[in-house]
Amino acid sequence: MKKTLLILAITLSTASYSQLSDDNWSAAVTQCLATNPIDGLCTNSPHGIMPDWDVSNVDDMSGTFKNRSTFNADISNWDVSNVRLMSKMFYEADDFNQP
């Protein structure tokens, strides 16, 4: 029994978040910012909190924060090396001023 509980505890502590891609990107952002529109600290997201998201498989971020005037999350740790499209990503995201 102890061994089973230990294995379960290790599994839960090392569980990874759901992968983001173009297929679920828009829905993930919408869901997260519905509960935490300023900082993206959506603890209920299957992807974790927005500043920690693994966006390495996202290709198109066009318009992601468009018209989200209060958005100001720190997304400086995102790996956007595979993103090709960022048109109007921060259009009218007036409060966004992170480095």
Where are these regions (language model features)?
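Sec-dependent N-terminal signal peptides
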Residues: T4-S13
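Negatively charged
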Residues: S16-P99
